């Protein structure tokens, strides 16, 4: 049950982040993980997992020490 809840949270966050990405310009920096976690009322772990998926799929680029950027 906990895993199912986690996947549901990830799906909800991913949908919200995809909307955010659609309205962003390539190269635009996204809010920090803590800011996104607070905005979507989830843990930073959930944000990290979704960002990792989006990076693997080429939607964002994460730069250590700098942030996460839109790739389109």
Question: Residues of each region from the PLM?
Answer:
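Extreme N-terminal segment that seeds HTH/winged-HTH DNA-binding domains in transcriptional regulators
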Residues: 1-44, 49-52, 56-57
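Beta-hairpin "wing" of winged helix-turn-helix
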Residues: 29-30, 55-65, 69-72
């Amino acid at each position: 049950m906990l895993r199912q809840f986690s996947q549901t949270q990830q799906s909800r966050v991913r949908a919200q982040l995809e909307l955010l990405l659609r309205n962003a310009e390539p190269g635009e920096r996204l809010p920090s993980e803590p800011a996104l976690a607070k905005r979507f009322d989830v843990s930073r772990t959930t944000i990290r997992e979704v960002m990792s998926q989006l990076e693997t799929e080429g939607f964002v680029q994460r730069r250590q020490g700098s942030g996460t950027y839109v790739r389109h």
